[in-house]
Structure formats: C-alpha cells, structure tokens
Amino acid sequence: METKIYLAYGSNMDLAQMKVRCPGARLLGAGRLDGWRLLFKGSRTGAYATIEREAGKHVPVLLWRVTAEDEKSLDRYEGFPDFYYKRQIQAVTVNAAGRDCGRTRGMAYVMHEKRRFCLPQGWYAALLERAYENFGFEKEILREALAYTAEHC
C-alpha cells in the first residue's frame, strides 16, 4: 500500500479528529518546519492555520504516515486545490526531549497566499492550543501567530 508523510500544523494535530478523518493514518512523531511562520487566513467560512516562508521562524508539526485514501479525505477537508494547495517541505524531526534527530520531506497543505488575514474562531484556536499542550510545543508560536494575524486583518 502506497503511503506518504503528511506534515500537520493546524487542526489535523488533533488526534481524535485525525482518527475519524483518516483512519489509516499513523502518527510518526513531532517535528518542525524551519524558515516558516504560522498565521491565519480565510474566507467567509472562517479562518484557519496556514504557513508562509519567513527566515528565522519555525512551525511545530506532527508527522503522519497517510494512505492514498487518507490523502483523498484530507484533500476534501482542506478544500484542495481551491483553498489549500500541496507542497513538499523538509521537516526537522525531533525526539521526546525536543532534540533534533533527523530530517525528512513531507506534504503540507498551504493556503493560497491571496487569501485574506483573518482571526480564527475561539474553538479553532483552543483546538490548536490543546494540541500544542499535548505535544509540548512552544505556545508562544501560537500566540505570535494570532498577534501577527491581528496586525494584518
């Protein structure tokens, strides 16, 4: 069965959601995207996490091994190709202590850059905050993303 690595930085860091959305997916561990910034953009339906290139920044991610069927489910959920597009990105993998332990390439969904900055609803921000807590990610990255987005709304 063909699989690929998927890099999740938004609501797909929620284990319960991923279990339902992508039953064949397996969590491989945590990592980060160096040279990327987390922010929020959206449309009339709401605001969601996305990433953009920025030197000196990094975004924590979960690495999932997904099947072709899981990827189709993610495509529907992410609004691919109209809302998000797919991009291969190199991630630094980290161990439980947060130390670098390797590099791997994976697929991430990136929102089209033309989308407007917009703050997410409280439930969405809370979902990401819980994921950051669960995996020991720096909550300051999430706070900074919200502040950066607010400045650009």
Where are these regions (language model features)?
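Glycine-aromatic micro-motifs
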Residues: 1-153
